[in-house]
Amino acid sequence: MTDEQVLAEFRAAEALLEGHFILSSGLRSSRYLQCARVLMNPARAARLAEALAFKIPDKLKIQLGSVVSPAMGGVIAGHEMGRALGLDAMFVERPDGVFHLRRGFRLEPGQKVLLMEDVVTTGLSSREAIKAVEEAGGQVIAAAALVDRSNGTADLGVPFYPLIRLDVPTYQPESLPPELAAIPAVKPGSRAAVAA
């Protein structure tokens, strides 16, 4: 799947938004990818996951024992990646502000895991999820995401395979360009709201 085909899937789902957005990282952006909209169609979600699975090297795929994703945004993407790879898919969640495996999910000691995200901006949620997998006894050997919007700066500590890289400028709240500052900010993501 080419980058243009991936973007066409987002456009068809009305998931590529323009405006002033507060990202889960706290950074601001003029564009937002609402992955929940692109993933709400099971056939589209499967196509995107299968295209991403194709990008992961076979030498890594054969080592994997499961897929783990962070709730909330990564749950559907992780489930579809599990289907594409023929692996169980689990998720970590933050009942107390810190990611944990719950709901009876467990990893065998040393089990090799693919961390699956919907979007990576700073990599903070991914690193927190990797820590939770390690604390549960697993070993994340690679990460994947539908979209890398980090401008190449996210360091997850493991090989990272995005379906598409979108270089959309992000800004600190105190360093907004005037045209963005003039638009009221909205927070469409899944992490708790940050002070504006």
From Swiss-Prot:
The keyword Transferase applies. Its cofactor is Mg(2+). Its EC number is 2.4.2.10. NCBIfam families: pyrE_Therm. PANTHER family: OROTATE PHOSPHORIBOSYLTRANSFERASE, URIDINE 5'-MONOPHOSPHATE SYNTHASE. Catalyzes the transfer of a ribosyl phosphate group from 5-phosphoribose 1-diphosphate to orotate, leading to the formation of orotidine monophosphate (OMP). Belongs to the purine/pyrimidine phosphoribosyltransferase family. PyrE subfamily. This is Orotate phosphoribosyltransferase. It comes from Rhizorhabdus wittichii (strain DSM 6014 / CCUG 31198 / JCM 15750 / NBRC 105917 / EY 4224 / RW1).
